[in-house]
Structure formats: structure tokens, C-alpha cells
Amino acid sequence: MKPFAVLGLGNSLMGDDAAGVAVAEMLARDPTVTDRAEVWTAGADVLRSMDRIDGRERVILVDAVECGEEPGRVSVVDQPPLDRPHGHAHWLSAAEAVELMRRAMPGLRPAKFTWVLVHVASIKAQEGLSAEVAAAIPAAAAAVKALIP
């Protein structure tokens, strides 16, 4: 098992919600990343990846977030707020899912979760990313690469 994991979250049928998927697909083609990290798309449910997450040194979750910030902006955070309303297609936010995993499995490893968030204007049923979000995919991929020693 590689010590690092990168999960691209999102739904490709929900427009900009697929930002995390696009980043993961880009990183999965980069041997400088795949030599050190396992990269996969996790759809819209982090909990389905629980068995693949446990035992990692660090897990990086890449997701779209609709929260009023400029579309295409990339943020790196260790813990998104749990009490902030989330605008995305998931039934649980990534932060809520990780908190649920930690409570259900007190010995859950990794010790560190990090989120790379791509800010979007809206998430709605459509195929393809908006121009602003598509332009941000390389920056989000670079942010992930910077987190993998």
C-alpha cells in the first residue's frame, strides 16, 4: 500500500461538481504522482472508499465547493467547517464523511486528511466543466502534488 492517497470526488453529470474527478484523472496520468500515491475517483461518496483510506499516512480529497468564493479559486484546508452549509451533490460533505469515519473507527489511520477545494459558481445537472473551473484544474493538480513529498 502506498502511503498517500488522492481521492477525486464528484459527479460528472453535475457540471462543475466533477472538478475533483478531473483533477484525479489528470494526476493518475502523472508518474511523478502515481509513484508515491494511489489516485482514484470516489464518485460522490467518500464512505465507499473507507477500506482503501485506512492505513494511509495522508489522504488528499479533491472536491468542488459552492460557497460564494470566486469560481476557479483553489483552496487547501486541513478541515473544512462542518457547520457551514455545503452546496454540492453529495448527501454528506467530504468533511462530514471523514468525521463519521473517525467516530465509527477510532483507530482510523491516516493521521492527516487534507482537502483541495475548487470553488465553483453552481452545481447543476449538465455535462462538462465551466471555463473558470476547467482553467483551475492544473492549479488544483499542482496543489495536490505539493502535498505529496
Predicted regions and their residues:
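N-terminal catalytic or cofactor-binding beta/alpha core of small enzyme domains
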Residues: 1-122, 127-138, 144-149
